[in-house]
From Swiss-Prot:
Annotated signal sequence range: none
UniProt-listed Pfam families: Sod_Fe_C
Subcellular location: Mitochondrion
Function statement: Component of the mitochondrial ribosome (mitoribosome), a dedicated translation machinery responsible for the synthesis of mitochondrial genome-encoded proteins, including at least some of the essential transmembrane subunits of the mitochondrial respiratory chain. The mitoribosomes are attached to the mitochondrial inner membrane and translation products are cotranslationally integrated into the membrane.
Listed name of the protein: Small ribosomal subunit protein mS43
Keywords assigned by UniProt, alphabetized: Mitochondrion, Ribonucleoprotein, Ribosomal protein, Transit peptide
Length: 268
C-alpha cells in the first residue's frame, strides 16, 4: 500500500538552497549593515543529458530559465514574511492568496523545474544502468505494470495526454487519492501538491470536482516523475514540430533509480 503523506527528509521536500547573503549600505553619516535570505540555483548532479538536451539547450532549459525564475522569486519575497521560507513552503503559503499569485507561480515553477531535472540522466548512462544487475527498480516496475500495464503503455498514455495539451504545462506521474499511480497535468506552474492549484481541466484526468473539505491529507498527490512541456525545454533541439520525439527521448533519459527512491520513500 502506498502512503501519500510525505516523510521528513523525503526527496520531494524543498529542493532549492536557502542561503544568507550579507550586504551593506553606506551614507555620509551612518553605515547600515543588513542581511537577508535568498534562494540560489543549485548545481545539477547530471550535466551530460545527451541526447535529450544539447549543452546549448540545457543552458536555456536549466541555467537561464531557473536563474530567471529564482531571481523573480527572490525579488518578490525580499523584505517580506516569506523571505525565510523554503521554496516548498512558499508554494503552500501563497497558493490561496491572490496578492501573492506571481510569487506562487515563480516558487512552483522553480520547484517543478528542479524536480524535472533531478530525474534525468544521459541515455548512455541510462542504458548502462538498465543493463546492470544492480539496477532492479523492482518497486517502480511493479507499480507501473500494475497501473499502466507496462512502461510502453505508460509512454503511450503520456503521448496521448501531451497531444491534447495546449500551451505551457507539466505532465506528472503521481500517487493519487486511491494509492495508485496516475497521470496528472498542471498548466503553467500548477502544483500537484494542492487540489486548488492543479490548474488542469482535462476530463480524462479529473472526473469530478474534488471535495476539498473531505480531504484528510496535507498533500493532494505525491509526484514521483514529471515532464516539462514548456516550449523552452524542447524548442532549441527539437523545434515546435517534433515534440513527440522530445518525449520519446525524455523517456529514454529517465533515471529510474531516482523514481524508485521517490516511490519507495512513500511506501508504508
Amino acid at each position: 500500500m502506498l502512503n501519500t503523506g510525505l516523510r521528513k527528509g523525503l526527496a520531494l521536500s524543498p529542493i532549492t538552497h536557502l542561503l544568507k547573503r550579507c550586504s551593506s549600505v553606506t551614507d555620509n553619516v551612518h553605515r547600515v549593515n543588513y542581511c537577508y535570505n535568498y534562494h540560489t540555483v543549485p548545481n545539477l548532479s547530471q550535466r551530460n543529458l545527451l541526447p535529450l538536451f544539447s549543452p546549448e539547450a540545457l543552458d536555456i532549459a536549466w541555467d537561464q530559465h531557473q536563474r530567471q525564475v529564482v531571481k523573480e522569486l527572490n525579488d518578490r519575497v525580499k523584505g517580506t514574511e516569506l523571505e525565510d521560507s523554503s521554496v516548498f513552503n512558499i508554494i503552500f503559503q501563497t497558493a490561496a492568496l491572490p496578492e501573492h499569485a506571481a510569487t506562487f507561480q515563480f516558487a512552483s515553477q522553480a520547484y517543478n523545474n528542479h524536480f524535472f531535472f533531478q530525474s534525468l540522466i544521459g541515455k548512455r548512462a541510462a542504458d548502462a544502468k538498465k543493463n546492470s544487475k544492480y539496477e532492479a527498480n523492482a518497486a517502480i516496475n511493479k507499480a507501473v505494470n500494475e497501473n499502466f500495464g507496462s512502461k510502453e503503455n505508460l509512454l503511450s498514455k503520456i503521448h496521448e495526454l501531451a497531444s491534447n495539451s495546449f500551451g505551457a504545462c507539466w505532465l506528472w506521474i503521481v500517487i493519487d487519492d486511491y494509492n495508485r499511480l496516475n497521470l496528472l497535468r498542471t498548466f503553467q506552474a500548477g502544483s500537484p501538491y494542492l487540489w486548488t492549484r492543479w490548474q488542469s481541466n482535462d476530463p480524462h484526468l479529473i472526473s469530478s470536482v474534488p471535495d476539498y473539505s473531505a480531504r484528510p491529507r496535507k498533500y493532494a498527490h505525491v509526484p514521483i516523475l514529471n515532464l516539462c512541456l514548456w516550449n523552452h525545454a524542447y524548442y532549441k533541439d527539437y523545434g515546435l514540430l517534433n515534440r513527440s520525439r522530445y518525449i520519446d527521448t525524455w523517456f529514454d533519459c529517465i533515471d529510474w533509480s531516482v523514481i524508485e527512491e521517490r516511490l519507495t520513500n512513500s511506501l508504508v
